[in-house]
Amino acid sequence: SEMCIRDRADKLYRPASIEKVVTAVTVLDVLGKDFQFQTTLSYDGVVEKGILKGNLYVKGGFDPEFMELDMDFLVRAVKEAGIQAISGKLVGDVSLMDSIYWGEGWSWDDTPEAFQPYLSPLMLNRGCVDIKVSPAAKGKAGTVEITPESDYYQLNNRSISLHPEAGKLKITRDWLTNGNTIDVSGCVSSVRKRTLNLYDSKRFFMDTFCYKLNKEGLSVSKDSIFFLTAPDST
């Protein structure tokens, strides 16, 4: 065959949503229609008097739909195993992926948008938080709800309810410094929602898992969190 016409053939373009078609066809061909993503929970050592004398492992399988309810299921599984405390490590196995969390050609300034998460085999809520801001009494700070519940992120609420002089409502995070402080400012005149990514999805997953274990009365230290990575990861 011969080339009929060529226009900027060597220029790198972002494929946009048409890439979803190529991805879907490839996944169906390589993995098959019955493939299921798996996030597995296991431990080594022994459980004596409620204390796990060993390590607790969560192995990520790139599940894009692993949500807060799924994490709550993992927490229940730990409790049902009779574990009340962990003397070893809380291990996040992310060895299915290298350390490059964005694809080649992805724009760095698309963060903190939800469509550009920091990819990891361990993804909670697609690596994002859902934020809802509602007005309170006039002149008071707006009411901010963030899910999933976690202590991995912080909230800086500078919004003012029903006060136009406060300016346009802004919901963002300190992404330029890879921070995870959610900043809400401006006038809250009606209910507003936004979804933002968080920096370091694997850490978001494991920190939140530890937070939820502690909330259920299990003794687990965040200092015990450890990651198993691919051999070529940094």
Give a label for each model feature:
Residues M3-C4:
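Short, small-residue-biased leader/transition segments that mark boundaries at the very start
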Residues R8-Y13, T195:
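A short glycine/serine-rich beta->alpha loop
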Residues D10-L12, I18, Q38, N55:
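A common structural microfeature
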Residues Y13-V27:
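Active/ligand-binding-proximal structured segments within catalytic/core domains
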Residues V30-T234:
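Conserved serine DD-peptidase/penicillin-binding transpeptidase domain
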